[in-house]
Amino acid sequence: MKKIHPSAVIEEGAQLGDDVVIEAYAYVSKDAKIGNNVVIKQGARILSDTTIGDHSRVFSYAIVGDIPQDISYKEEQKSGVVIGKNATIREFATINSGTAKGDGFTRIGDNAFIMAYCHIAHDCLLGNNIILANNATLAGHVELGDFTVVGGLTPIHQFVKVGEGCMIAGASALSQDIVPFCLAEGNRASIRSLNLVGIRRRFDKDEVDRLSRAFKTLFRQGDLKENAKNLLENQESENVKKMCHFILETKRGIPVYRGKNNA
């Protein structure tokens, strides 16, 4: 059964799933699509063509789907936000809709945990199981791979790509691409080591060892792209392949490694 507070504004045309809860003074636009068992808390605003997956929660005064902060954007352009299942969007977070420079949509996968005051700009593409700590700020067109964690108070420059399973330390500033399964830190952030905590949670010891050897081979000495090409030869680990292909395809470059060679 839906529970909608009398003071909430639900525009005609909005699609609401089963057992939705919409609290006082919340706003849902006519083009929004809200999944089953979604909770929209007091004062939250769901705007434009926004889809929110089942079992998600949008906390007080978060704004999802407002127009992008892009001076080239024209309001007649179709745009919106697509969010997967089991998302948590905490207080005062802002997620802007996409632009014609992308496909018109900002996209976030399943199981996202977006903490208070985070900002996700237009056309960002976030994978599954993403965590953004308080005040993390993603500029336009940023891409985050699955299982990536971004620490609090960390801005990420537009068009940066962060690979799967990365950890970006709090109070860093990121302007270049980060290789999958790595930990980056600093202003400007550089790769320091493997994200050992993250990969040990997901992979067995043999795979962790393979990733550790690959990291040392890639970053210890020589040209990074040449190392990646050589490592790809006869490589059996799909995760090591992801690291190598990411290095070979980067457009913004990989930040200089300043860690210890003991990952």
Curated annotation (Swiss-Prot):
Coiled coil: none
EC primary class: transferase
Cross-referenced Pfam families: Acetyltransf_11, Hexapep
Enzyme Commission number, as recorded: 2.3.1.129
Database matches in InterPro entries: Acetyltransf_C, Acetyltransf_C_sf, Hexapep, Hexapep_transf_CS, Lipid_A_LpxA, Trimer_LpxA-like_sf
Role: Involved in the biosynthesis of lipid A, a phosphorylated glycolipid that anchors the lipopolysaccharide to the outer membrane of the cell.
Subunit field text: Homotrimer.
Recorded family membership: Belongs to the transferase hexapeptide repeat family. LpxA subfamily.
Protein name per Swiss-Prot or TrEMBL: Acyl-[acyl-carrier-protein]--UDP-N-acetylglucosamine O-acyltransferase
Organism the protein comes from: Campylobacter jejuni subsp. jejuni serotype O:2 (strain ATCC 700819 / NCTC 11168)
